[in-house]
Design a protein with these regions (language model features):
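Helical (often loop-to-helix) elements that flank the catalytic cores of nucleotide-handling enzymes
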Residues: 82-95, 115-119
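DNA replication initiation on ssDNA origins
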Residues: 1-71, 79-89
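Histidine-centered divalent-metal-coordination microenvironment in nucleic-acid enzymes
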Residues: 74, 99-119
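Short glycine/proline-enriched loop/turn "hinge" motifs that connect secondary-structure elements
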Residues: 61-67, 94, 101-106
């Protein structure tokens, strides 16, 4: 887990929470939508662990106390998933040798990650 904390390191004095207990359904997309909120508690290694095991759904603030970022992510969620062409994005990343790591999201979209060696 230390490797995960190292690459997803950012602001450690607060983090985002996606609370699924009172989730609503988005009428436009039909997708479940959690109650998003911000908590001003320490983002501890245990919180990371709870996220990785699925106990909590949290989000790290990528910028640290100095406003520097070590990672970033672009979240691509198309309006219509049926005709979503992931291959276009994958080929574009390869064609231009972009330093992005594409991961399919739970919804079927894409998350494009960018990592820096240091702040």
């Amino acid at each position: 887990m230390n490797g995960y904390v190292k690459i997803f390191n950012g602001y450690r004095h607060a983090y985002g929470i996606a609370d699924w207990t009172n989730a609503t359904v988005d009428p436009e997309s039909g997708k479940k939508k959690p109650d998003y909120r911000w908590t001003y508690e320490e983002f501890t290694d245990q919180i990371y662990q709870d996220h990785l095991t699925g106990e909590k759904s949290v989000g790290a603030q990528p910028t640290n106390e100095n406003g520097d970022a070590k990672f970033g992510v672009i979240d691509i969620d198309p309006k219509e998933y049926e005709g979503f062409n992931k291959q276009f994005y994958l080929e574009t990343i390869q064609k231009y040798d972009l330093p992005l790591i594409p991961i399919e999201s739970k919804s079927g979209g894409l998350h494009l990650y960018l990592f820096m060696a240091e702040f």
